[in-house]
Amino acid sequence: MLNPIVRKFQYGQHTVTLETGMMARQATAAVMVSMDDTAVFVTVVGAKNAKPGQSFFPLTVNYQERTYAAGRFPGGFFRREGRPSEGETLTSRLIDRPIRPLFPEGFLNEVQVIATVVSVNPQVSPDIVAMIGASAALSLSGIPFSGPIGVARVGYLNDQYVLNPTTDELKESRLDLVVAGTQGAVLMVESEAELLSEDQMLGAVVFGHEQQQIVIENINSLVAEAGKPKWEWHAPAVNVSLEQRVQALSEARLGDAYRITEKQERYAQVNVIKTDVVAALQAEDETLNAGEIQEILGNIEKNVVRGRVLAGEPRIDGREKDMIRGLDVRTGVLPRTHGSALFTRGETQALVTATLGTERDAQNIDELTGERTDRFLLHYNFPPYCVGETGMVGSPKRREIGHGRLAKRGVLAVMPKANEFPYTVRVVSEITESNGSSSMASVCGASLALMDAGVPIKSAVAGIAMGLVKEGDNFVVLSDILGDEDHLGDMDFKVAGSREGITALQMDIKIEGITREIMQVALNQAKGARLHILGVMEQAISTPRGDISEFAPRIHTIKISTDKIKDVIGKGGSVIRALTEETGTTIEIEDDGTVRIASTDGEKAKHAIRRIEEITAEIEVGRVYQGKVTRIVDFGAFVAIGGGKEGLVHISQIADKRVEKVTDYLQMGQEVPVKVLEVDRQGRVRLSIKEANPQTQEAAAPSSEE
């Protein structure tokens, strides 16, 4: 019999329901989590044993949205969900980051978390619901896991923090921050902000962590009622004798290797040491496992680097804890791009370009709650050559999507509004060298490339990655971390912003016990680093260029009456298509009558504007127009005037004498002058050829002598 176990609790303005025991009973654990009609079904399956020879922890997290959740059909030919969208990939990473550090060291059994959105309320984002579900399912499963975690979204409205704001509230909020953590520690922060101060950001993190305790309490209550027995798992026994032998052979040599400041040379030396140690030990005892020796060597490396930092000695590359690597900033490095920059910080380098386009270049994004368009795109590419390796080149991986989104968050707050700058903007960051903090190099490069392209951003932005080494109460915060310091440290803390405030904050913490004091030190140290980088960037380019590139499309904006929109578009789009072909421009019309004409050639744009003005001009009675015959009928001819408007020339108005047959005087496509006699209430236009012809008028005029 199905026997569901349910917990309900109030979480801010929402009601959260946790339910287990009803579905997917063959999974290790399964939970249905709902928050005001947004429901996510989360399952966890863990392998009872690790695969032979497994050397890493194979955790996979898959977040998937089903269109039926919103009562919609999937797009595409097959009408079925396909590969994960960018949003699904980002949410998968968001779930993965806070849970990964909570599995014990040495646990190598395969674990898969699948979160499926099965119902969606447009006002409640499913990502927070999915994270709560993953925490609950892992806690119920019995798999070794130091959870549960809580999670909260924090907004900032009217100078007040808002817990789990609705979608509408987020549009007005100056902050969108997601914080996850255990009962005693923050583990992950992901946020974008509109130039908030360090204190405001830290306050949001602390607020979110305090508020999410109710989630942890309710998951613990659910586990007490429905949790499965804890697995009998023990960490592999430590081979103390082998550790001592490895240490004796390698510690001093690794210490010398980590004084080599150049990355490739250091890596080469470390690899030689590791190969020598494995060979020496296996020569003594060929039954020894090379993987076990490599793992011990990795721990010795970690201890060497961390010990030096905590002792106040210089870092791997010789810097002090708060020093930034050497900077080289160049703009306008590519001749035909609309904007470009080369940003180099030590051994990390990004070639960044900015491209301007029209509204039709904007990305159409099909989300669960409907379609939206994105006018600012930022893409991050991390090719294998940037770290001196070979590898597959193809579609972006999860990491590239995540880093691109972080860089975009860093720049978004300073981008101009559509009514100020009606262009779609695409920024691409090509990482050409990498030794730590390439996403923050992308923020700096994006700011420079946008200024070089003439995009009127509100201010320059820069990004910096901070690290942490902590043992007991002793801790050191590191500015501008290297790749090794990221790998061997306890925290990766990325901050982007301008001189006025923070635009993005991302934090991943590998240990418990990160206090408010440590976060405060890190934020303040990051501010100093950010201001230093901005100072160097401003020497290269301090304000956006006064004009856009000659190779970029220029957008000219005019306004027409809304009742004239149909005239410019024409039947089935015939008029606007003809205009586009005739003028060689791109023309876009909005519902309020705003017309945007884009062209790299100023004369073509002027021609398009002139033609649109002709089409939308009011027909004046008594005025003579040049028209073209479009249809011939027995009682006269229809003539197109004023860009698509048609009027009738009655047979009696063709000539000053009796006309028996219209085709004796007019042919299809013939251009003739016509005078407007009348526009009736229904908008029908009556025309005359004979009154438009000066000779006819002179002949018909009475003599002045009479």
Curated annotation (Swiss-Prot):
Q: Name one GO molecular function term.
A: RNA binding
Spell out the subcellular localization from the entry. Answer: Cytoplasm
The record ties this protein, via SMART domains, to: KH (SM00322), S1 (SM00316)
**Which spans of this chain does the record mark as coiled coil?**
none
Function description: Involved in mRNA degradation. Catalyzes the phosphorolysis of single-stranded polyribonucleotides processively in the 3'- to 5'-direction.
Family classification? Belongs to the polyribonucleotide nucleotidyltransferase family.
| Name by which UniProt lists this protein | Polyribonucleotide nucleotidyltransferase
Identify the species of origin: Pectobacterium atrosepticum (strain SCRI 1043 / ATCC BAA-672) (Erwinia carotovora subsp. atroseptica)
